């Protein structure tokens, strides 16, 4: 081992960012109150930030329910805030992120995908374009690429081959980002879902043998 880097950023982060940018508009994201104030961004980020315990606790707190009811009353588009209230009452954050994940996977092969979301008595259909997904996941993607280049810099050598694993390694967008950062270095993949566990098991064997 000549170098290593790491950060808690992965597939969930891609799904969360895509859900935030592409799926929260029908729930009031980007709308205003009757007095012209923008709806608070955190009310649309916190319910889908499923890997952030603090954000989840804030959104699903009893105090926040009062804030959501107030925003619903003051909203120019109250029907959208009614859906956000349903996210609170029915704990829909995980299902929204799951819909984003399904769209992300579909957009690996197609230019557009439709996310179908059941909320209240409606079945919402939200179209997501591949270009919109690329823009939505730019922040976590950039973090991942920075980790790759940092590891190469610390190691002081260009790798002979890059091994990508984990579910997100299937994404052509991430693979293209790695190829751009390290051109002319071949990328290989193993078991997308088993390699991480196998690697951890082997390292545990080294540590606790």
Task: Name each region found by the language model.
Residues 88, 92-93, 157-178:
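Glycine-rich phosphate-binding loops at beta-strand->alpha-helix junctions
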Residues 31-37, 47, 151, 155-167:
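Short glycine-rich phosphate-binding loop at a beta-alpha junction
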Residues 1-119:
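Phosphate-binding glycine-rich/basic clefts of nucleotide- and phosphate-handling proteins
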Residues 20-29, 180, 184, 202, ...:
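Short, well-ordered loop/turn and helix-capping segments at boundaries between secondary-structure elements
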Residues 99, 103-106, 135-162, 177, ...:
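Phosphate/ATP-binding catalytic cores across multiple sugar-kinase/actin-like superfamilies
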Residues 4, 110, 118, 165-167, ...:
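Generic beta-strand/beta-sheet core signal
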Residues 8-9, 175-202:
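Conserved phosphate-binding/catalytic loops in two-lobed NTP-binding clefts
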Residues 85-93, 121-152:
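Adenine-nucleotide phosphate-binding core of ATP-dependent small-molecule kinases
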């Amino acid at each position: 081992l000549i170098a290593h880097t790491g950060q808690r950023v992965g597939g969930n982060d891609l799904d969360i960012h895509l859900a935030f940018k592409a799926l929260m508009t029908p729930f009031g994201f980007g709308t205003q109150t009757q007095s012209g104030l923008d709806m608070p961004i955190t009310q649309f980020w916190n319910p889908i930030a499923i890997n952030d315990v603090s954000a989840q606790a804030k959104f699903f707190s009893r105090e926040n329910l009062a804030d959501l009811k107030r925003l619903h009353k003051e909203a120019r588009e109250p029907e959208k805030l009614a859906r956000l209230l349903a996210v609170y009452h029915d704990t829909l954050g995980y299902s929204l992120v799951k819909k984003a994940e399904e769209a992300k996977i579909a957009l690996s092969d197609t230019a557009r995908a439709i996310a179908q979301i059941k909320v209240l008595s409606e079945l919402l259909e939200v179209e997501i374009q591949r270009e919109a997904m690329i823009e939505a996941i730019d922040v976590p993607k950039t973090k991942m690429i920075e980790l790759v280049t940092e590891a190469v810099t610390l190691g002081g050598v260009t790798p002979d081959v890059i091994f990508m694993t984990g579910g997100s390694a299937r994404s052509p967008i991430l693979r293209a980002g790695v190829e751009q950062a390290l051109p002319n270095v071949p990328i290989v993949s193993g078991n997308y879902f088993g390699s991480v566990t196998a690697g951890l098991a082997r390292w545990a064997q080294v540590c606790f043998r």
